[in-house]
Regions:
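Alpha-helical transmembrane segments and their immediate juxtamembrane cytosolic regions
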Residues: 1-237
């Protein structure tokens, strides 16, 4: 949460692709957030007692986070008005990733699926996730994490392999330095050693992250307006 907040604050206060070493350092540390979320979804799916409610919670916050995220970064609330990329927050592909885990999981799923059907559905989920923050990679990486539970080395290296494709797109289409920074997800490795694989006992924790995520984006959006924008930027553009 600290890494994510620092990263978003840096993007709000110093927008663009500044090359100051300390700014790059903040964004590098911010790469901790995404893989942590992917681990959270894989473990949340594994330990949830009610998958339907878990999915409903993710969907509700995906909708709320869409408006908060776009407000924070000045992205139009009208999808695809300016771009097909980065049109909504990472909560949307996390929601799709949870569906992907259910599709993959022959034990929990209440209906049979052949392998080609599972592959086809996962491709559709990736397509639906494509316009969001981190694109389709939360779907792919979360599934990889779930498939390799108990093998942290394989989980992390697999994520890095997937993110290599994301880095290539960044480097070719946006910015080389910031593209390479995406490899910073690997710094999650030592932190994941502290997770013991058990379900947390604090009931409030299942709500805290989502509420904090939406709330901090709104506050960053207000800060953006104060520093850089005017009332028209509430709607992006």
């Amino acid at each position: 949460i600290i890494a994510m907040t620092a990263d978003h604050l840096a993007s709000t206060i110093w927008p663009g692709y500044g090359k100051e070493w300390w700014l790059l350092g903040i964004h590098l540390i911010g790469r901790l957030a995404a893989p942590t979320m992917w681990f959270m979804i894989a473990e949340g799916y594994q330990h949830t007692r009610n998958f339907k409610k878990y999915l409903q919670r993710l969907f509700i916050f995906a909708v709320l986070a869409h408006f908060a995220y776009n407000f924070c970064f000045g992205i139009s609330l009208i999808p695809f008005r300016d771009s097909v990329l980065n049109q909504t927050s990472v909560i949307w592909p996390l929601f799709l990733a949870a569906i992907g885990l259910y599709i993959y999981d022959d034990e929990k799923r209440s209906f049979p699926l052949k392998n080609w059907q599972k592959t086809a559905i996962l491709l559709v989920l990736c397509l639906l996730a494509f316009p969001s923050d981190w694109s389709c990679f939360p779907v792919l990486c979360t599934l990889h994490i779930y498939q390799n539970r108990g093998n942290l080395r394989k989980q992390v290296l697999g994520m890095v392999a997937y993110i290599s494709m994301y880095v290539i797109v960044w480097c070719l289409c946006i910015d080389v330095v910031y593209g390479l920074i995406q490899f910073g997800i690997i710094i999650v490795w030592p932190f994941m050693h502290f997770y013991n694989g058990t379900r947390g006992k604090a009931r409030w924790m299942k709500w805290f992250f989502y509420v904090f995520y939406v709330g901090h984006l709104v506050l960053c959006g207000i800060l953006r307006l104060i520093l850089h924008g005017n009332v028209t930027t509430i709607f992006g553009g």
